[in-house]
């Protein structure tokens, strides 16, 4: 290494045609690496590495890219250039200044003079990016503000929900919702949740953004399935006895031969039964053992049924029969005849008529009607007497109050 007249030190082994900072000359492939506050110039024997200081520089052209932490710039290029400048700095390198040029090298500091060389296309010095910035190239990471993880009651215990608000970009102010499993796995969408949970949790009415079960979504899904013509065709029995048409690729409709062992049998259809909703038979038996009471919590005595009404079937008594007859009177407009078939005593499970109460068949005679009319007249007469007694008692109370008020005024 030899000293430079300007006070700097230059590394040996620098080939001709390579220039240092502040100098000029014809250069080959060169790379510039810019430092923070100072620099040292040290071209390599082959490619010519030059480190440029705060002030001073050269001209050339080439490609550049951002270096590491110091915010410097390095690149490679070919060209000729000239420049004048001064620089101070410290660095390490190997190099040798060209004839007639001057510069800094090694790990010393100093000033460089000027040199001359052939002109060429100017080289732009890229502006270094500040430390910690996103740098050139594709868009940097989006700034977000993390929210607090909260428990999600709609999911199994241990699941957390987090809402993250975007702080930059065109979508600033919007939020993203994430869910975390008890093991810490992150989920970004509802399909991911459904695949992970499987059949353990029904997510058909789950709202991913609010984290709650929405019954309105479930009703919409049911209504959509109900209105779907494909689902309407499922589950309906086909009782049509007409011969079907062969469904083949032929453009002509060909009949199908129907083969049966009982050609005389006919299928009977009951349209009323098809429209009837399923219900529980003899639901009035659930009222067995229950009794009504008045305002004084006294049990009201049940009414007595006529002697002609007798229960039928296992576990039948007067209370159950009374409930069955009352429910039939209020819920059905058909006449009540009881179990007409005599075979119901032998096998009630087969011959029982579910539209009639569990009582034997009975016949209402004229004598029964006359007795019922007499009972109704007696009850009405008792009611009339009770109402008259109440009216008289109210009138007597009013008259006594008037007399007391008159005596008070005279006094």
Curated annotation (Swiss-Prot):
Residues found modified as Phosphoserine: 181, 407
Cell compartment(s), UniProt: Nucleus; Chromosome
Gly residues compositional bias, start-end: 98-121
Biased composition (Basic residues): 77-95
Segments of this protein annotated with the region Disordered: 1-158, 214-241
Region (Required for interaction with DHX9 and PRMT5) location: 1-149
Molecular function (Gene Ontology), one example: identical protein binding
Record function comment: Binds CpG islands in promoters where the DNA is methylated at position 5 of cytosine within CpG dinucleotides. Binds hemimethylated DNA as well. Recruits histone deacetylases and DNA methyltransferases to chromatin. Acts as a component of the histone deacetylase NuRD complex which participates in the remodeling of chromatin. Acts as a transcriptional repressor and plays a role in gene silencing. Functions as a scaffold protein, targeting GATAD2A and GATAD2B to chromatin to promote repression. May enhance the activation of some unmethylated cAMP-responsive promoters.
Name of this chain's protein: Methyl-CpG-binding domain protein 2
Species annotation: Homo sapiens
Lineage: Eukaryota, Metazoa, Chordata, Craniata, Vertebrata
């Amino acid at each position: 290494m030899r000293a430079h007249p300007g006070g700097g030190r230059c590394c040996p082994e620098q080939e001709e045609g390579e220039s240092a900072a502040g100098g000029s000359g014809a250069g080959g492939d060169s790379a510039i690496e810019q430092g923070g506050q100072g620099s040292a110039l040290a071209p390599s024997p082959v490619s010519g590495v030059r480190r440029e200081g705060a002030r001073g520089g050269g001209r050339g052209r080439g490609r550049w890219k951002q270096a590491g932490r110091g915010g410097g710039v390095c690149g490679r290029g070919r060209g000729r250039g000239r420049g004048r400048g001064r620089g101070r700095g410290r660095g390490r390198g190997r190099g040798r200044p060209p004839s007639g040029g001057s510069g800094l090298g090694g790990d010393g500091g100093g000033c460089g003079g000027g040199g001359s060389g052939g002109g060429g296309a100017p080289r732009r010095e890229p502006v270094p990016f500040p430390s910690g910035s996103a740098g050139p190239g594709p868009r940097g990471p989006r700034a977000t503000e993390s929210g607090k993880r909260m428990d999600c009651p709609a999911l199994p215990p241990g699941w957390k929900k987090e809402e993250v608000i975007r702080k930059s970009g065109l979508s600033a102010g919007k939020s993203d919702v994430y869910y975390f499993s008890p093991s810490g796995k992150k989920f970004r969408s509802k399909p991911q949740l459904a695949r992970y949970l499987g059949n353990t949790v029904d997510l058909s009415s789950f709202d991913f953004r609010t984290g709650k079960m929405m019954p309105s979504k479930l009703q919409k899904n049911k209504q959509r399935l109900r209105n779907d013509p494909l689902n309407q065709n499922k589950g309906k029995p086909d009782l049509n006895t007409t011969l079907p048409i062969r469904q083949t690729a032929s453009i002509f409709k060909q009949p199908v031969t129907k083969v049966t062992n009982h050609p005389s049998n006919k299928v009977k259809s009951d349209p009323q039964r098809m429209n009837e909703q399923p219900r529980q038979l003899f639901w009035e038996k659930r009222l067995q053992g229950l009794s009504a009471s008045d305002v004084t919590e006294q049990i009201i005595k049940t009414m007595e049924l006529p002697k002609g009404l007798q229960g039928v079937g296992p576990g039948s008594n007067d209370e159950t029969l009374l409930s069955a007859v009352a429910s039939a009177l209020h819920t059905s407009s058909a006449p009540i005849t009881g179990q007409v078939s005599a075979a119901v005593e032998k096998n009630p499970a087969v011959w029982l008529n579910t539209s009639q109460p569990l009582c034997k068949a009975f016949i209402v005679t004229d004598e029964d009607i006359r007795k019922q009319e007499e009972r109704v007249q007696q009850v009405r007469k008792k009611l009339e007497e009770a109402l008259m007694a109440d009216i008289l008692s109210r009138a007597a109370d009013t008259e006594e109050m008037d007399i007391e008020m008159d005596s008070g005024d005279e006094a």
